[in-house]
Amino acid sequence: MKAERGRIMVIGKKEQRNPRQEQCAQVSMLCRQRLLGYAESFEELGKSFCEEVGIVGDDRQSILEKYMLQQSRQIMGDHLQTVARIMERVAGEELVYLPLEEKKRKSLTQAFGSEGIQARELCYVRKKSIPGGISMTLSTERSGCKASQAADMLTVLLGKRLQPSPGSPYLIEKEPHCFLFTEEPGYVALTGVSRALKEGEKISGDQYTMLESERGRLILLLSDGTGAGEDAGRGSGRVLDLMEKMLEAGFDTEASVNMLNSALYAQNEEGDHPTVDICSLDLYTGECEICKVGGVATFIKGRSGTEYIGGDSLPLGIFQKAQTERSIRTLKPGEMLVMMTDGVLDALEDDCEERMRNRIDMLEEQNPQEIAEKILSYAICSCGGRIRDDMTVFVLYLWENA
């Protein structure tokens, strides 16, 4: 497997590079070389699993068993190759350290010191596909000192609106920790959720969650378990838990969905086929990636009207490869996205997508919670107040970061 070797660059005046920076560069290069070695091993192992073997047998049962084994080998091989590609990507990322100007470094160090915070190893960080920022090691004897307070200080001192990255510690403590402060995105997303349980049930089979990535993306996840009640809720909850872990580990949306689908397909549990809807919003550009596996239509209300996307794919675990509907849209301030489970649309019965589109188009509210509640109320009223399935409405409204 051919791969471009990863690089680390430390830019600045030669005299500003201290032995610690040189050592960090050498360690990083060694780690990258090891990652590429591991990636090559995983790639070759994956290829060995994917090699096709002639299927022969004396009876129908033995042929079927060998065919199922061949499918399992193919799934395993695909996953190993996916892991190899992620290792390659991480190893190939270019990380740039740019030491702060001496005058600015002293100014920041003194300012933090006056607040009882020790700041060391200050430098600019540049990394492809991740917002640039400032990295520093912070510690304090104070209790309850939040990283957001340090971000506020940097905002005032540097004249740039900064925030702690999602991966940075929440508190500054006695023990020194590394913090990364990145520029605030140009957009702010507000969300609202409204839910209703199926009649006679105490637990919803619908589950939702949100997470923020290091790359400045807000990710919304919505899953509808098979049926309703506790078992359905357990299934959809497991889907979101695994999706969240894979996305946080660095898998992209498509790889995460395929690996999750393969796991459910391999379990071969009849009747357990949850759906998953994913909305990944770039808070710097407004680009919104919508990925749907079995979920009903997602609605986007823009300045020119309301459109609906998808709703034709099958749930997870039915086929060896997930049937994914993927769309890209760019949201602008004042526009909103509405995700929902099938219990909401099914309540509208005939021509449900068009009826829901018209209803959303008529809404004038800007509060996402109010919007979610109005949509849910409309669905419940449309079915005469009888809730025959779990209902969840998930609304995202985009604002400019003033």
Predicted feature locations:
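Catalytic core of PPM/PP2C metal-dependent serine/threonine phosphatase domains
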Residues: 99-132, 149-151, 155-176, 184, ...
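PP2C/PPM family metal-dependent serine/threonine protein phosphatase catalytic domain
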Residues: 112, 184-207, 261-267, 296-328, ...
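Short hydrophobic/glycine-rich mini-motifs in sensory/regulatory modules
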Residues: 130-133, 186-188, 213-219, 333-336, ...
